Amino acid sequence: DPMPAEDIVDLAYES
């Protein structure tokens, strides 16, 4: 299953 958009955003801005 694809990850929720919110989870993607969280990972993208983790740096």
From Swiss-Prot:
Reported function: Enhances intestinal motility in rats. Increases serum levels of phosphorus and magnesium ions. Has no detrimental effect on liver tissue or the mucosa of the small intestine. Has no hemolytic activity.
Originating organism: Eugenia dysenterica (Cagaita tree)
Name this polypeptide is given: Laxative peptide
Highest classification ranks of the organism: Eukaryota, Viridiplantae, Streptophyta, Embryophyta, Tracheophyta
